[in-house]
Every structure is written in C-alpha cells, then in structure tokens.
C-alpha cells in the first residue's frame, strides 16, 4: 500500500466494494458451491465492483475459488463484538445479545478462539490470490486494541502477502495497513454529500490519513418493498415481517401504491449513491468505498437497502450499465457548484476523469449539454492524457443560459471517445418570472383569514411548512431514513423520499420526475400531513412513509373547502431560492386555470386540527448551532462568584429536546468575572438521546486563568487527547455514531493530565 491507495502489482487501485452480511434466506447457511459464488461475483463485476467485505465472517473456500476466477478481491473477518452487545437492554429486549459477550482482551473464550481462527484462515485460504485483506472484525468498540494489535503483528510476520487491519470503524492503530471507517478520529467523516452541487470532495479529511482509508458502509438507503416479493421466501426464512407490514399498508389504504413508492424511493437511492461515489472518486487520497449494500438484508428487523433483493435479483431500480457510469475503473466526472440555475447565469463546470485502470488513455473527452428532447445546447471536446492511477483534470466549460425561455431539465453528458466510459448529470434552468397578479389568497396559517376566504368561495394557497402537530404530521427530509427503524428507532426522519404526480397540471411550470430529484433538495424543509382517514384524497406529492409505519402522507394536495378551493403546500415557498420561486409560480399558475377544480371535500374543523400552529421559542446560540437538540451554557444561572455543587438548575439550556435530559458528575461549578464552567479533575457527562441517531457533540473547554490545561477525553470508550490549551478556549468536536445512541444515551468522560482540572463552559449536540 501507498499512503493513500491499495496497490495491486504496484498499481493504485480504487477499491469499489460491497458488504456480504451472511444472508442466505432460502437455506440459512452460505453456499459451498463454486458456481453459485461465481454467479454472485459476476453480479459484482457487472456493477463495476472489484471487492467484497465479508462483514464479521469468513466465507467457505468455494467463495475464494470463485473470486480467483472472476477477479474479486476479498476482505475476510472473524466476528463482531461491540460495547452495546455487552449490556442488558431492558427497554429493548430484542437488542440484548445472548451471553452478553465482552470485548476481545476481556473475554477468555473469544481470546482463545479469535487468534486461532485467524491462523486457520490464512493456513486454509492464504494461497488464494483473491484473499487480499484480513480484518479481525466489525466495530470492535469494547475490545483491547493493544492485545488485538499483537495478534495482527504476528500474522503480518508469518504471512505478509495481504493487508491487515485490526477493526473497522473504531480506532486506527500502528499495525493497521489500511482502514475501513466512516470517521477518521479527530479528523472527520469519510463520506457524505456536502454542498448543493458536485463541486465537492473529502480531500481535507482523507489527506490527513497515513494509510489507505476505505469509506465504511456507504449508503444504507432503504427502498419501499414490492409486496409480491413475499412469495419468494420459500425456504428457511419466512417473510412474516413483510406480511405484517403489508397489513398496515392495507389498513391505511396504500397497499396498491407499492410500485409507485418502490420506483420513487429507488430512484432517490440511485441519485444518492451516484453522488456519494462520485464525491469519493473526486477525492485523490480516498482508497475506495464499501457499500451497505447492493442487496437487501432481512436481519435486524429488515433493512431493504439494496437495488437487488435478498436473492440477488434486480428490483428494477438501476441496470448494471447505468451503475457502471460512476462505478468503474475509469469514470468521467463533472464539478459544478449547484444543480439549479437561472437564465441570467452562466453554467460552469470542470471536467475530470478518474482513471484507475492499468492504461493511460490518449483520446478526446467530449461533453454535451442537451435538453430533455435531445436538442443540443452546446458541446466541447478536449484531448489530454488520462493518466492511470489518478484523478485527471481535463477541461472547463461555460454555457450562456440566456437564450433559454422556459423552465427545463438539461443533461450534461461526458464521454471518452472510442470507449464505453460515459457519465451524465441533470441540471435545472429557470427563467425569471413575475408572480401572476391574482386574487388568490396566499397565507401561512389556517386562521380566520383563510377560513373567511374559503367560505366566500375564494382560492387559497396555504404555505403549510410550519403547520401541524406531531400526531398528524411528519417533517420533510430529502434523504431517506437510515438503514431500518427496527434497528435504529429514534430517527425523526420516517420517510423514503416522495412520489410525485409529475403529469399533474400543478407542475406545468415546474419540470419534475416522479421522485424527488436534486432540485427538490433546496426546498425540502417543511411538513407532510397524515391523511389515513382520507382514502379518496389523491396527493399531488405524496412522501413515502417508512414501510414500518405505512402512513398515507401528503405534502402538496388540493381540496374543496366550504365554497372555496384550497391548495396546500408543505414545502417552504418563501425561501430565497430559484426552486422555491419556480414552484410557487407553477402552483399559482395552475390555480388561475379552469382545471383547478378539486373534487374532494374536507371540513374546516378537520383542517383546523390538521394545520395547527405552534409558535417557535426564540433561542440565542452561536452561529452554526441553531440545529442543536441540546445546547447548554454550563452554570450560567449561578449568581454568586465562587464554586457550587453541580445541579441542572444552575445551567442554562438554550435548546433542549424533550428527550435530551442530562446529568453531570464534576467537582463543582465555578464562576468568576470571566464566566462560568463545570470543573473537575475527572468529569462524566451523561446525555439521554433519541435512540439510534447520529451527530456531533461539541464541547467548549476553557483555560481563562492560564493553567495550561490538558487532558484525555473518552466518548463511549473512544479516547482522544485535549492538547495544552495555553490559556485559550477550545471547541472539541466528537463524532457520535448510531451505535453510541442505540441505548438512548451517550457518555463523555474527561480526565485531567495537566493544569489541575478541566473546565467546560458550553456543550452542544447536533443531530445529523
């Protein structure tokens, strides 16, 4: 390996992988048939993948033999033990692991088995060229890394033919030759889509690593199921869970919409995977990615996150040819800073090519910009050497958009001439419009103004993004929920994108597909409303409810109210955004037409309950912390200078989600003319959280009396160093994983190394 890449025959390779989670629903055990593994690995290759991570298990020899033949690299492992498996979960008994296994180094039976099993693995399969990576196991958070490092060093000395790592996603040790993780300690996350376009990467994070880092468990975007898949479970595993979920869909009158929801959530998954993978390909120091996963997983409740089902059959979401556009040895890339443009702007983009093949290409790279009918707007071509093993800068383009007169979707295509390598991106272009002068009432509350207008037979556009209560509405999100609410039940996001009636005349001036493509991301702030009691109401935009819930939802819908006509929009139309303005224009344009004639009636009293308004409390927090679910000014309510025992009544909680209670063990609270802080040689902060959420804990350490404070921090057992503060304040950002909050709490411990004690003046938890 080099500093940032895994080398095969001394050539940098971008690792494109998928997780195999030991899931065989027909038999209940892994196949030992070479042909079956050849079938599976041929599917890998068809989607442009080159390796597999066997999550916490080692496959039989048939898999290694098939991988040798097909050309797939293997990462094999032994087990998975994390801290949450070692505790009794009274509130969630299904999460209590049998035997409550302790971590390696603290578990005599496992401490004997694991090094022996590692040795057996390399003795049995070590001669297979596909066996390129070995890791002890998955997320070994409560294990002794010093002891595990000794095991790995012994293997490296005995058989240096492959790369070795101790654990995924917890801690990087000196013996690690590569790392699979979603977070580099004290540095940042290894994947995610930042920004509103494609002009982004994660080089600022990966460049700080000193070994190749592969993004861990990328994706985990669920797709709504097709109920006829239940019939495929004819073996060891019965789909009783899906049968139960289907009955909930029947109850709420949405069973027949499964294909629409499947297509819409699947299309959203596709653009998100494309965005994530290209972001990593644009990152020169990234070693690759491992997806979770291309297939559904029927464990942990069920995580229907694949574009293939649990039987390796296509779900009709994306073809191998389409996926290889951005998952291949050679991938054309485009950098532009936003997806939505106005006609008084110039569309600009940078063209790159990631080439991780074994050949330098010298051939023209061609780009075109076309509309949805294929009409060419502009094109260009440039020939530069596309060097192997790097991301190549190829060309830049500028397209004047001023001749476009109507809103439209446009395609940027980049093709490497004479090769199969091609990629495509969508952008949306909107001309400037003055809102139509109408007598339509536009209002953001369902109050006497709206009711009076409807009773008089007027038309009303209700901008409802701030309306609704918890029991009759749900927040809107662009991305789907994570993995599965069976396993991570505390998520506030309970949707999988939205199905859009794209042919509806409300969208005549707002080009859209039948799913939420990138232009919707700008405005996906607001509410959708639960309409289970309205089976005959057909939403214009229907968010896809998590199949564990199966509510019938509506974020844009129309109805007849008294003598009037009401169009409801749960998206924020008041944003300073071309997308918000264009959608508002399109809705108003529709409302001026004769075909705005809703037939479904809803009573005023019903709408009063649906559109209840709760004023937001005003908060004062530093910029960047507005979205905290907990923000504490430590000891701010203390009146007199000096020290006092900690009590929550002396803190000031600027923001506090009702689920985020906390307690602090410290020496005291201190107050002087410089401020207030929790202080202690050793402190413990325990924060209750919604279960299964992910985020960042920000802690502000003080040293205003110049004691050169320094210490050791431990968040859920992961240690980091607080360096000498030298009299300065210091914000520390600590990554919180979903597994950390799966027991409904996080625990931060601090230990003073220098300066007498540590001081914490503010603490904030921001949920991602």
Segments predicted by a language model, with ranges:
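Secreted/periplasmic carbohydrate-active enzymes, especially glycoside hydrolases
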Residues: 1-57, 66, 70-74, 132-133, ...
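Catalytic beta-strand/loop cores that center a nucleophilic Ser/Cys/Thr
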Residues: 469-470, 486-579, 595-622
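Substrate-binding/catalytic cleft of secreted carbohydrate-active enzymes
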Residues: 39-47, 51-308
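A general beta-strand register signal
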Residues: 7, 415, 560, 714-716
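Compositionally biased, intrinsically disordered or flexible polar/acidic segments
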Residues: 619-768
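Extracytoplasmic/secreted cell-surface and envelope-processing proteins
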Residues: 62-63, 83-85, 143-145, 462-463, ...
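Mature N-terminal, pre-catalytic/accessory segment of carbohydrate-active enzymes
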Residues: 1, 394, 401-440, 444-446, ...
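Short alpha-beta junction capping motif
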Residues: 438-485, 563, 569, 587
């Amino acid at each position: 390996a080099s500093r940032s890449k895994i080398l095969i025959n001394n050539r940098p390779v971008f690792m494109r992988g998928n997780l195999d989670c030991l899931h065989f629903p027909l038999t209940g055990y892994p196949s030992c048939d070479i042909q079956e593994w050849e079938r599976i690995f041929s599917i890998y290759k068809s989607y442009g993948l080159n390796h597999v991570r066997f999550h916490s298990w080692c496959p039989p020899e048939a898999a290694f033999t098939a991988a040798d033949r097909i050309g797939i690299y293997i990462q094999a492992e032994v087990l998975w033990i994390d801290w949450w498996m070692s505790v009794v979960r009274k509130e969630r008994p299904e999460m209590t692991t049998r035997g409550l296994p302790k971590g390696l180094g603290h578990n005599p039976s496992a401490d004997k088995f694991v090094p022996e099993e590692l040795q057996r693995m390399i003795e049995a399969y070590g001669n297979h060229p596909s066996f390129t990576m070995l890791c002890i196991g998955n997320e070994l958070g409560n294990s002794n890394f010093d002891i595990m490092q000794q095991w790995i060093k012994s293997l490296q000395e005995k058989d240096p033919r492959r790369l070795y790592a101790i654990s995924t996603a917890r801690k990087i040790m000196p013996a690690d030759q590569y790392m699979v993780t979603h977070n580099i300690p004290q540095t940042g996350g290894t994947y995610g889509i930042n920004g509103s376009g494609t002009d982004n990467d994660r080089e600022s994070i990966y460049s700080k690593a000193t070994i190749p880092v592969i993004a861990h468990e990328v994706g985990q975007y669920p797709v709504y199921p097709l109920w006829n898949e239940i019939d495929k479970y004819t073996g060891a595993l019965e789909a009783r869970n899906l049968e139960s979920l289907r009955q909930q869909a029947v109850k709420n009158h949405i069973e027949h919409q499964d294909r629409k929801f499947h297509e819409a959530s699947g299309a959203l998954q596709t653009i998100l995977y494309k965005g994530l993978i290209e972001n990593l390909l644009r990152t020169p120091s990234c070693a690759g990615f491992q997806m979770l996963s291309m297939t559904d997983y029927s464990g942990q409740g069920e995580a229907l996150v694949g574009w293939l089902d649990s039987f390796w059959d296509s779900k009709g979401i994306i073809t191998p040819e389409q996926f290889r556009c951005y998952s291949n040895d050679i991938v054309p890339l485009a950098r532009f800073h936003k997806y939505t443009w106005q006609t008084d702007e110039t569309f600009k983009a940078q063209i790159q090519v990631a080439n991780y093949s074994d050949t330098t290409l010298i051939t023209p790279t061609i780009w075109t910009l076309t509309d949805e009918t294929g009409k060419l707007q502009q094109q260009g071509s440039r020939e530069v050497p596309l060097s192997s093993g790097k991301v190549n800068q190829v060309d830049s383009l500028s397209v004047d958009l001023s001749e476009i007169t109507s809103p439209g979707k446009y395609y940027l295509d980049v093709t490497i001439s004479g090769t199969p390598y091609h990629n495509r991106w969508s952008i949306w272009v909107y001309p400037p419009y003055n809102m139509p002068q109408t007598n339509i009432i536009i209002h953001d509350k369902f109050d006497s103004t709206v009711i009076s207008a409807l009773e008089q037979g007027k038309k009303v556009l209700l901008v409802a993004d701030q309306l609704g209560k918890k029991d009759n509405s749900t927040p809107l999100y662009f991305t789907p929920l994570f993995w599965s609410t069976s396993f991570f039940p505390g998520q506030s996001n309970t949707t999988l994108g939205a199905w859009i009636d794209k042919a509806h005349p409300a969208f005549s001036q707002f080009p859209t597909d039948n799913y939420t493509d990138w232009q919707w991301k700008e405005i996906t702030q607001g509410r959708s409303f639960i309409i289970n009691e309205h089976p005959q109401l057909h939403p214009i935009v229907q968010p896809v409810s998590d199949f564990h819930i199966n509510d019938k939802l509506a974020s844009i819908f129309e109805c007849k109210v008294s003598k009037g006509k009401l169009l409801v929009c749960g998206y924020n139309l008041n944003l300073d955004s071309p997308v918000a303005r264009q959608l508002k224009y399109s809705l108003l344009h529709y409302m001026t037409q004769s075909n705005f004639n809703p037939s479904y009636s809803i009573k005023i009293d019903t709408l009063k309950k649906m559109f209840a308004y709760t004023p937001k409390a005003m908060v004062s927090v530093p910029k960047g912390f507005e979205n905290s679910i907990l923000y504490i000014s430590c000891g701010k309510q203390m009146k007199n200078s000096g020290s006092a025992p900690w009590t929550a009544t002396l803190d000031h909680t600027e923001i506090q989600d009702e689920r985020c209670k906390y307690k602090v063990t410290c020496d005291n609270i201190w107050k002087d003319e410089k401020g207030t802080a929790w202080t202690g040689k050793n402190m413990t902060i325990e924060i209750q959280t919604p279960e299964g959420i992910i985020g960042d804990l920000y802690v502000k350490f003080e040293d205003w009396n110049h004691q050169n404070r320094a210490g050791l921090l431990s968040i859920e057992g992961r240690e980091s160093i607080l360096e000498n503060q030298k009299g300065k304040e210091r914000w520390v950002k600590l990554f919180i994983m979903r597994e950390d909050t799966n027991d409904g709490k996080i625990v931060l411990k601090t230990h003073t190394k220098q300066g007498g004690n540590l001081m914490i003046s503010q603490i904030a938890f921001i949920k991602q």
